[in-house]
Every structure is written in C-alpha cells, then in structure tokens.
UniProtKB/Swiss-Prot annotation:
UniProt binding sites for Mn(2+) 1: 178, 180, 217, 368
Main function: Part of the Rad50/Mre11 complex, which is involved in the early steps of DNA double-strand break (DSB) repair. The complex may facilitate opening of the processed DNA ends to aid in the recruitment of HerA and NurA. Mre11 binds to DSB ends and has both double-stranded 3'-5' exonuclease activity and single-stranded endonuclease activity.
Gene name as annotated: mre11
Mechanisms controlling activity: Nuclease activity is regulated by Rad50.
UniProt-recorded name of the protein: DNA double-strand break repair protein Mre11
Annotated keywords: DNA damage, DNA repair, Endonuclease, Exonuclease, Hydrolase, Manganese, Metal-binding, Nuclease
Statement: the UniProt record of this protein carries the keyword Manganese: yes
Enzyme class of the recorded protein, top EC level: hydrolase
GO molecular function terms noted in the UniProt entry: 3'-5' exonuclease activity; DNA end binding; endonuclease activity; manganese ion binding; Y-form DNA binding
Cofactor: Mn(2+)
Active site residues of this protein: 253
Entry EC number(s): 3.1.-.-
Length: 587
C-alpha cells in the first residue's frame, strides 16, 4: 500500500512540475522504517529499482524527500546512499555498519569511528552537503522536550495541538458568511440572530484565530437599522481590539451601486478591512491584501446581482492571480454551478472554470448551506452557510436539523481540513401537518392534536401546514389561536408556514415554497408566462429582474437622508437593476 501511495504522489508531482504548479505544492517527506526491507541490495537485485529507490535518486527534483531509518546501513546500495544528502548519525556499535556510514558521509568522518560507537541517547552527528563540516547535535528526550515547553503528561490534546501549532508556525482563521444582521423582524428572532453572531466571534477568539473572514452579507441591507449597526460595530471593534483583523467583501445584500454602504463606513472607521481592490486594465486585475501577522494574501470579488457576477469573473486576469506566490485566499460571494444543491437549481451561479486556479483556500458566501468541496487544481472551496438564517426557509432548515456556524481553518503553507464549528443560539422544533382531504374545521382540530404531542418549551417552533382542503377556506384555520396555544406551551417564537396550504374552492397562483426570494421568483415567473412579451431579455430574465427590483425598492430611508435624496437613490438603484441610466431624476 505504501508503494502504491508513494508512486501516485511521485507521478502527480512530476505532472505538477510539467505544468508549472510545483512551486505552489508542499514539500513531501516519505519516511521508511526498517529501510532495508524495501531498499536492501537483495530486494533491488531481485525486483529491480522500486519507487523508493527512484525517489532517493530523483525525488528532490520534484520536492519529494526520502527519510530512511535503519541500523543496517550496509544492506542499502551505495548508489542509493550517495543520493541521500543529509544523514543523522546515531550511536552504532557494529564496526561494519560504522564503516558504511563513514564511507557514505558527505564529510571525512574517518577520525570519528570510535565517537560514533560511543554516542549516547540523544546525541548525533549530522553530515550533509549543506554544511562545510559534520555537526554534533543534542536531541532532547521527548519527555524533556514537553516539560521544557511548560506542558505536563496529563495535559489535554488541545494543549498539545496548540504547542505544535506554535512550534510549526501554524496559523488559524475563522471563515464566516451571510450573517444578515437586521434581517429578522420578530424581536426574539432578531435577538437570536445577533446572539449567533456574538457567539461565533467569541468562539473564534477562544480558538485564538489570527484573523477572520466574512464572505459577504454581514448586514441584510446596505443601509441597515442604526441600532443593528451600533451593536454590530461594538462586537467587531472588540475583535479588532483583540488584535484580530476582519477581512470582508460585499455580499448581494450589503452592496449598493449608487450610495455608500455600511461596509464602506465601517472600513473608514478602521473596524474592518475590505479586500476587493480592482486594478484597472484590459483585464480585471485584483490587488492582494497581505495579513501582517501570517503573511496570508487575500483578494477576491464581491457579490453582484444577476449576470453581472459572471461578467466580472470572465474579465479576471486569472494568469496574474495564479502567478502570485504564498498562501492565497480567494474571497467570493457567488454560487458555483458545479456545487449547487439540486433544490437550488434556479439560483444564479458562476462556473468554477472562471475562478483562478491553485489558490490555497476559496472562501465562499451567498449559498445558505455549509459545504466543503475538493476539486483538483484548487484548494478547499468552502461555504459556511448562513450563520442563523434570514428567511423562513432558513429557519425551517434549522428546525429540520441543518447545523449553522462557521469554519475554523489552520494553515502553514497550505490549509488543513477546515473544521466546522456549530453555533446554536436556540433550540428549534419542526412540526409538519398534512391536512389533505380534510375540511377546514377538521384540519384545525388535527393541527391542535399534532402540536400537543411536542415539547416546545423555550424553542423556536416552525409549524408547516400543507395540503389541499376538501372544503372551506384556508383562512378558516386560525393561525393566531394556534400560535397562542404553542406560546402557552412555552414556545419562545412561533413561525407558521401556510404557503403549501390550498383549497379546492379557491386556487389562484399555485406555489409550494417557503423561501421568500424563490417564492417571489416563482410567482413572477407564473405571471410572466401568461403575458405576451416580445422582449427576449424580459422573457429570459424577467423573474430575476422583478425580484431584484422589489428588493431594492424595499430599502428604507437612511437616517439624515431627506426625501429628495432618498427618491434619487431609489431611482438610481432601479436603473441599475433595469440596466438604464435614469440619472436620479426619473428621466
């Protein structure tokens, strides 16, 4: 098995060198204990050169090293020993073996024969082509090494991991996205939304991260409620004062083409660092932001509406980005076509081939579900998902078991496997009632019996009522009394989803959807299908344009903004969506 794995590594690294990718790959050391079993003269004479002897001779050209451990040096061919540039020589009392060691050393050790025989535990001589003379070294016992570092044998695994992390200059960062602060209107949900944000920052600080990344949609609006901004700023400043930078990009919600976003204001105040900095030219160049402590290089693109995202990606100067060395993070706020969940097939996306290749980490946002994807030629492509949830569909997924949180990433010259850190500010309870075939009165009583069997104390309850009533109106099912009953049972928050409820007596627009943007899109699409529209763009993108226009028109007047300024901003936003230059005066 070891031979198969080593051969595959060697083959891939040969290929990386041929394609110019080798310098961005980590150096690999392959360790063989009892080395004569695979590198012995008899083995090679009987089987011919194997992958280990090949790596001994050629591996360094492809950033692969071989570490052979043995006391019986004489069993290994001189041709193999000669290609091992550094030898750590421990005590050996066998004269024949000492002779082979001395004969294959990079320096003249003929006067050290007896010294090698008398080397004690922890004593060694290093002979290497990289030094002018052999170097005596002292190797501490593992127990002494741990004690000198201030650790004891009973210390936890976390203590040991932290010790090695510091010793190996391993760094950490937290990757968050889609916090959507200010999305929730219900006071308790708004508090939980913020609590999730605070808990994530606290957890990341406790994990001693070196920096944080928020991959878009920190706020639910580009001009959020001022109380939301105040609380968020206090938390972000607390992180910054702890010596932890926060790197962000715009999401599709907190970007505005016509006015200053709250992201810009927070950057001006020194609370966060916006990392998307285009370089003008025929191709779209991107400037890297270098983290001062770790040397990590961060760049990327912000979220945009509709097809604008793909246009920006197509203009990218990928060749220049790929040529940059170091540990690179590409920050983005877009769905990737190859990784879209099946039920999100309608979501606009960007093809992976438009991304620069070879970055060590791809920090994604916009998709509200967590995911970590590995694709050849790319570092980990990671979506943390929404931190709490901005829509009813998100909260329903929470209640059905979807975990929310952020990713903790450790790295040296490459990223280790990202660790998902769950953040749970509240417990959820999911209740689903299918009332198909019931009249409205029977359906109401069935719902009452169903909820009575659930423990909802202190929980956020997501009640989904679906099915087609045989008679009666859907409004006959009294949501207010159902909510009161659940609250009397101790529920903290009650959300009732009736989108899937219909009746045979009345059928208007048929939709079965709980995610508000997708619900709006489906309604617009159904209405468009009934219109005689000759404009090709409206036929193909009409639903997307309508949803985006609706979202822009929902923006409230900002503090200090007078009526004419507000109207001008709304008109310019609408023009941006429609692809028109309205000039802010409606003309």
């Amino acid at each position: 098995m070891g031979s198969v794995i080593s051969a595959e590594i060697f083959r891939r690294y040969q290929q990386y060198k041929a394609t110019g990718e080798l310098r961005r790959k980590p150096v690999i050391g392959i360790v063989i204990e009892e080395a004569p079993r695979v590198l012995g003269k008899e083995v090679i004479e009987r089987q011919g050169n194997n992958i280990y002897s090949t790596i001994a001779r050629e591996g360094r050209k492809f950033n692969i090293g071989l570490i052979a451990i043995t006391q019986l040096v004489s069993l290994i061919p001189r041709t193999v020993l000669a290609n091992m540039n550094t030898k750590i020589i421990l005590g050996n009392e066998m004269a024949q073996e000492r002779a082979e060691i001395i004969g294959s050393a990079s320096q003249d050790l003929s006067a050290d024969n007896r010294t090698i025989a008398s080397l004690d535990k922890g004593e060694a001589i290093v002979s290497s082509i990289f030094t002018k003379f052999a170097v005596p070294v002292k190797i501490p016992l593992f127990e002494e090494f741990i004690e000198s570092a201030g650790l004891e044998s009973e210390d936890t695994d976390d203590d040991m991991i932290e010790f090695y992390r510091v010793g190996l200059s391993m760094y950490r960062f937290a990757h968050l996205s889609d916090c959507h602060l200010g999305a929730q209107k219900h006071p308790d949900l708004r508090e939980l939304e913020f609590e999730a944000f605070r808990m994530a920052l606290d957890d990341a600080l406790q994990k001693d991260v070196d920096f944080m990344i928020i991959a878009g949609d920190l706020f639910h609006s580009n001009i959020p409620n001022m109380e939301t901004v105040k609380r968020a700023t206090l938390e972000l400043r607390r992180v910054r004062e702890a010596g932890v930078p926060i790197y962000v990009n715009y999401g599709s919600h907190d970007y505005s083409p016509s006015s200053t976003s709250m992201i810009d204001i927070l950057e001006s105040a020194g609370v966060i660092d916006k990392v998307v900095r285009p370089i003008p030219g025929k191709k779209l160049g991107l400037e890297f932001t270098v983290d001062e402590k770790t040397g990590a290089k961060i760049t990327g693109l912000s979220g945009r509406s509709r097809t604008l995202e793909a246009e920006y990606f197509m203009k990218l100067d990928r060749e220049a980005l790929e040529a940059e060395d170091g540990f690179r993070i590409f920050l983005f706020h877009s769905a990737i076509t190859q990784f879209k969940p099946v039920d999100l097939a309608d979501m606009e996306s960007v093809d992976l081939n438009l991304f620069p290749r070879g970055f060590e980490y791809y920090a994604g946002g916009h998709v509200h579900r967590k995911g970590c994807y590995i694709e050849e030629g790319y570092g980990p492509i990671v979506y943390p998902g929404t931190l709490f949830g901005s829509y009813a569909g998100d909260l329903e997924e929470n209640a059905r078991g979807e975990t929310r949180g952020y990713y903790l990433v450790e790295f040296t010259d490459r990223a280790r496997e990202p660790e998902f850190r769950e953040i749970r500010p509240a417990e959820f309870e999911y209740i689903e009632c299918d009332v198909t075939g019931k009249n409205s009165q029977d359906a109401y009583h069935q719902i009452g019996r169903e909820i009575a069997g659930h423990d909802v104390t202190g929980k956020v309850v997501m009640l989904k009522i679906r099915g087609e009533l045989s008679s009666g109106r859907t409004s006959d099912i009294d949501s207010a009394s159902i909510r009161e009953k659940l609250e009397s049972m101790g529920a903290r928050v009650v959300q009732i989803n009736r989108y899937g409820l219909s009746t045979r007596e009345i059928q208007k627009v048929r939709v079965v959807e709980s995610d508000v943007p997708r619900l709006e899109r489906r309604i617009f699409r159904e209405k468009l299908a009934g219109l005689d529209i000759r404009n090709r763009r409206l036929m193909e993108e009409g639903d997307s344009i309508a949803v985006e226009l609706l979202r822009r028109l929902e923006n409230e007047k900002a503090p200090g903004e007078n009526k004419s300024e507000y109207e001008k901003r709304i008109i310019e936003d609408a023009g941006d969506v429609l692809g028109l230059d309205l000039g802010g005066d409606g003309t």
